[in-house]
Regions:
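…primarily DNA-binding HTH/wHTH and HhH modules…
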Residues: 78-83
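Short helix-to-turn junction characteristic of helix-turn-helix DNA-binding domains
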Residues: 32-36, 75
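A generic structural micro-environment signature
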Residues: 25-27, 42, 74
Length: 83
């Protein structure tokens, strides 16, 4: 019975991998949620627009989302902006 419980626990870990956003990705998500464009984000963070786009792609890939509303939902449900 203990082995079965361990197997179920291990499957849950695989089914729900931990999503870790970098500090910079968290900054960008917050600005995206605030409605800033890539250009506005790049100006605010003193980075290029292409760097912002790279971070956005990584954020969407990590969260397995493809739209801002889905990203906002994932961020809220998984508490991804916690420090």
């Amino acid at each position: 019975e203990a082995e079965m419980a361990l197997n179920q626990f291990q499957r849950k870990i695989i089914d729900y991998p931990q999503i870790i956003l970098t500090a910079r990705e968290k900054q960008i998500v917050k600005l995206m949620i605030d409605g800033l464009t890539n250009k506005e984000i790049s100006n605010a963070l003193f980075i290029s627009e292409s760097t912002v786009e790279t971070h956005r792609k990584n954020i969407y890939r990590k969260t397995e989302t493809h739209s801002l509303p889905k990203l906002i939902q994932a961020v809220a449900n998984l508490n991804l902006l916690a420090d």
